[in-house]
Amino acid sequence: MALTVTWLPGLTHDWFTVPGKGNFSPSSLRNWLSLLTHVAGHSGWPHLVTNFSLILLIGPMLEESYGSLALLVMIVITALVTGILNVVFFTTGLMGASGVVFMMILLASFTNFSRGEIPLTFILVLVLYLGDQLLKSFGDGNISYFAHIAGGFCGSLFGFFIPPRRY
């Protein structure tokens, strides 16, 4: 689906982009659906390949650790959070799975840790990732670094409050 969406720019803009602040119409079913579907829309081939390569790399480990349903719920929540925040705070549209990717990156650091401890990998990834995203936020205006940060925040919360399955 994401490949088709990426190759059909009109479809991507109409159905797979969350409108920005002032452009979201509460009476539009398409706008409400875009709060979830924006993660399938991508600005081009490099954007799609980068996001889905990381999802394919990290996703199976998280699915094994948390289960398919729990991971799906985390993805849906992250999509909703990034979409809603974009509608509330930003005038530009939002598309792509980068928020989901960063949720997965930070969640992955929690897969093998003891409760009551903060994993060192989490601290390192958080510092490197957050620093990188904050620095980049002063550059290219076409990338929603805020969505990346919001996705990472979701992954951090999921990691702290949803324990991985133990076998």
What are these regions, as identified by a protein language model?
Residues M1-Y167:
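A detector for small-residue-rich transmembrane helices and their helix-helix packing motifs
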